[in-house]
Amino acid sequence: KLAPIPHPAFTNGRSFFDVIAKRDVLLHFPYHSFNIIPDFLREAAIDQKVTKIRITIYRVASQNSSILNALINAARNGKQVTVLLEILARFDEENNILGAERLRSEGVHVIVGVRGLKVHGKLCIVSRKEHGKVRHYATIGTGNFNEDTAKIYTDHILMTSAPEITQEVLYVFNFFKNNFKVPRFRELIVSPFNSRDAFLEKIKREISNAKKGRRA
């Protein structure tokens, strides 16, 4: 059994914000260490320039989760922390409810799902004041922010500060609070709004490429 490795982008104690401001970083679990995610949140919790943290949590690892602890520390340090916690996650309902209660008791704003939908997206966005403007740093993943399952499940997380992507991540979080208004997406594929059409379009494109003898 091999131990997970650190990502080379984050060696030598470099700031997550300094790295992600310059380039996107793709993490591949369980081969990369999941510690990168709670470490990113810990840095955000103590960074004086960070004003807000928004995150979706589908399955709480435990009541002593490093993710929960980092978010609570951020709230204690005066950050505005919003957590979309899906209490309908199968077999984890009780654990998630307890997690929601703990977060609320520490001043975290908790949204317990969206009426009529199950939120399965894995998103986090940190807002930071830089040079008189607000810059956003997002993580978009296929797997839960869960340090236990990250050891055995194969997943990816993209860390990015690209404005065209982070703006649409903000649209998603705004929808969680005001779900009467459905945003339009250009970069993100978001169910149940545009995923079917987006995937059909991509399939048709590859069919067309194959017919023309192109790589498909």
Where are these regions (language model features)?
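N-terminal localization/anchoring segments of enzymes in phospholipid and broader phosphate metabolism
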Residues: 1-216
